Amino acid sequence: MMNSKIKKRLRGYIFSRPFMEERVPQHVQNIVIRDYCSKKDIQYLLSATEYAMENSALMLRQLVKDLPSMDGIVAYSIFQMPEDDDERQSIFNSILSSNKEIHFAVEGLSLNDNDSFNHIESIWQVKKTLPNCNFL
């Protein structure tokens, strides 16, 4: 008997520049995303690559505009989202208000409701605060 469940269709989102002091080759980002989608039974649509200009989120914004043609986005990491809180939260709110979702392959997380929004924002705030902590 065939499974008639329709797979979610998510567009990949990768970086061509370092993010949060990390640098991951594009082909590795795509491998991680493809593996994540395979394990979650998600149809992976080829990745869009963010522009190399510092702080650019032009491709991410374009993906959000294109959401009506897919079920969501799968990014390599939550730390590829804009560092600016207002910009990041605006993008997340646009995704939620479209009844779509965004997944983060490395962290194994997805944003699809207010609880997941708050959880991901908490992770962001910890990551941004850690460099200012003196552990000695």
Regions found by a protein language model. Give the residues of each.
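Short, structured surface patches at the beginning of a domain
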Residues: 1-136
